Amino acid sequence: HRYNATLNDKAAEDTGRPGFENDVRLEFSNNPDHDGDGTTGYTPWDTVVCFTYKLNILKTNDHDLKLEGAKFRLYSDKELKDEVYVKKAEDDGYIVINRDTVGGSDHIGGTTHQDSVEMVSNAKGEIKIYGLDTGIYYLKETEAPTGYRPLLDPIVLNLKATFTDERNDYVKGDGATDKTLQKLETTAHIKEFFDGAYKESDVDLTTDTSEGSSNLTVINKVGKKLPVTGSSMMLLMLTAGTALVTGAFVYGKRQKKSNDEN
C-alpha cells in the first residue's frame, strides 16, 4: 500500500532537520471472507520522514549595497512555462504552493493559485523561499531595482540531498540526526554579460544541512551593460557611435580654429 500526505504551509516553513514524521498503520479484517465488519487487526506502526528546503536570496550591487525592489519568479523548466507558485509567508518570505491544490502534481500542471505572488526583495535585499523540494529550478529576475538592468538569463539552481541507503528502515526520531538526511548540496549556473565580457560560471552555494538552507547572492553590477542577444551588433554600433561623436568633436574644433584664423 502507498500512503500519501501533503505538508501544510506551516510545515513547509520548518525546513531541514528533523523533517516531518508520519506514522501510519493499516487496519485489516481477521476473516478474509468477511466484508470488513466485526473483528479487525492492525499492522505495526510504520514511520516515514520527509524533508523540505529553503533558499535564501540576497540582492546587492557589486559594492555590497542591498537592493530593494528586485522582482523574481521561479520555474521548474528551462522554457519558463511551469512556474513554481509561491505565496507570502508570515515572516516576509515566500512559501511554495503545492500544485496538488490547483489540479497539478508537485511543481507541474494545474492553474495559477489565487494567492500566488511575484517575489520582491525587501529593504534588506532579501528573499526567502520555503518549502522547496530537491531538483532543478530556474530563477528569473523579471524586474531590476531602479537604475539597474535585470539579469537576462535565469539562474539555474540544482538542489541535491544525500540520504542514507537504508531509508526504508527508518527509525522514529532519526530525522533529527545525520543518519537520514546526510548532506545538502546546491549549485548555481550563472550567465553574465558585463562591460563587453561574457561569462558562464558554476557556483557551489553555501548550505546548512541542518536548516535545509542554501544561500544565493544575486549581484547587479554598476557600469555599462549590454544584452547577450545581439551583443556583437550592439557593441559595434556603440563603438561606431563613439567614433562618430569623437570625429564630430575633432571636426568642430578644427572648424572653430579655422574661423578664428580668418
Which role does the model predict for each range below?
Residues 1-262:
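Solvent-exposed loop/turn and edge beta-strand elements of beta-rich ligand-binding domains
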